[in-house]
A protein has these predicted regions:
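Short, non-helical or kinked segments that cap or interrupt transmembrane helices
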Residues: 1, 15-39, 172-189, 203-212, ...
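Alpha-helical transmembrane segments of multi-pass membrane proteins
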Residues: 1-9, 158-163, 199-218, 231
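Hydrophobic alpha-helical transmembrane segments
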Residues: 2-3, 38-43, 77-82, 89, ...
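Transmembrane alpha-helical segments of multi-pass membrane transport proteins and ion-pumping complexes
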Residues: 9-21, 45-58, 85-96, 120, ...
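Core mid-bundle transmembrane helix pairs that form the ion/substrate translocation pathway
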Residues: 39, 43-46, 55-132, 139, ...
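Helix-loop-helix hairpins and the membrane-proximal interhelical loops
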Residues: 97-205
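Membrane-interfacial segments at transmembrane helix termini in multi-pass membrane proteins
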Residues: 209-213, 217-293
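Cytosolic Rossmann-like ligand/nucleotide-binding regulatory domains
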Residues: 298-349, 353
Length: 364
């Protein structure tokens, strides 16, 4: 619970968005299965968001002026469907190219220091032309949102540069996040789509920032696959509730298209990569085992159960119990609150059995 609360508090402090930080933990980490953790995370997020708002009263995202286009319902529906389809297609490419770069860059026959030098030179070269485009790129996004360019070609080149730089950064292995770069990419794609609509005479220049905010939602939903978190987050950090309902429509459509395209969430790709690096034989080795450690909570299903009489799914076995700083053999023991139980299972079953086994040891 403290781990989840810390994750939510960090996001809340960064964006001054306590509600979306709690949703992130519930939707992405706990998968709607831990109300006590949700309450803890919400309290931590409210406190962290309150402190952040006290120290930084205003956020730059509030300065974006979002004006809804005056289009008919059906015309807006057509544009949103088209936009969601385009974003889903780009996200599909993104989900394929990022793992490719992450596999390709380490195979280069160069020392780590040489690779980092090349990345440093690339970052410096980009900074000479457009300073705010490096890093997360949020300052560049803010500039475009408040007084953006009308040049589609120039914006397209900037998006391409930011995209390539993000790929190299994510593949370098250096510490850093992907959330802000993804947010910026979505916003710039929304601006580009808006400028194309302006060129076609569909909307006015004053509506481009509106499309930018919707683009943030769409691309984050497509890449991260946490629609509730993203929709609430963009609404919270921008303060533009007029974008809330379009975000629901576009976010829902984008999520549907990503399901059709079978796009794997980026967080899952990162986790799989990290897990493979630490467990290179998993799960290709036939009969490989995985050891899961859970703590028994008071009132849970496993509380008070005798290990010898306990039947676990898919031939899972309790190997040992950690109690009072001592490791005990599981045979003949009765589980009590506070026990840390070691469960052995087939490695191939970890994805489908993890949540059920954790639920048996916890109160949800």
């Amino acid at each position: 619970q403290l781990l989840a609360a810390g994750a939510g508090a960090g996001l809340s402090a960064a964006f001054a968005a306590p509600l979306s930080s709690s949703l992130l933990v519930i939707e992405s980490i706990e998968r709607f299965d831990a109300p006590k953790t949700a309450i803890t995370t919400l309290l931590a997020g409210v406190v962290a968001g309150g402190v952040a708002s006290w120290m930084f009263p205003t956020t730059p995202y509030h300065l974006i002026n979002a004006v809804s286009p005056g289009l008919s319902f059906w015309r807006q529906a057509e544009l949103y469907i088209l936009f969601a389809a385009v974003i889903a297609a780009i996200a599909k490419f993104y989900s394929l190219i990022v793992p490719f770069f992450q596999r390709w860059l380490p195979t280069l026959k160069l020392s780590v220091y040489t690779k980092m030098l090349y990345l440093l030179i690339a970052a410096y070269a980009i900074s000479l032309t457009e300073t705010n485009l490096t890093g997360g790129g949020e300052q560049f996004l803010m500039m475009q949102g408040m007084d953006g360019t009308h040049d589609i070609r120039w914006l397209g080149v900037m998006i391409l540069i930011h995209f390539v730089f993000t790929l190299l950064s994510l593949s370098s292995g250096l510490p850093g996040g992907s959330f802000i770069p993804t947010l910026v990419t979505g916003g710039l794609l929304g601006q580009l789509f808006g400028l194309v609509l302006v060129q076609r005479g569909v909307i006015g220049y004053e509506n481009v920032s509106y499309m930018m905010l919707v683009g943030m939602v769409a691309f984050l939903v497509a890449v991260v696959r946490t629609p509730l978190t993203v929709i609430v987050l963009i609404t919270e950090i921008t303060g533009h509730f007029e974008v809330f309902y379009p975000s629901i429509v576009v976010g829902g459509l984008t999520y549907y298209f990503t399901e059709l395209l079978q796009i794997k969430p980026y967080n899952v790709l990162l986790y799989d990569r990290m897990f493979r690096n630490h467990n290179p034989e998993f799960p290709e080795v036939e009969g490989a085992c995985y050891h899961l450690y859970v703590e028994i909570m008071d009132g849970s299903y496993l509380d008070g159960k005798e290990v010898d009489k306990l039947t676990l799914p898919n031939n899972c076995i309790i190997l040992s119990i950690r109690r009072d700083h001592k490791t005990l053999p599981a045979a003949g023991e009765t589980l009590v609150p506070g026990d840390q139980v070691e469960i052995e299972m087939d490695a191939k079953d970890i994805e489908k059995l993890y949540e059920p086994l954790v639920s048996m040891a916890n109160i949800y």
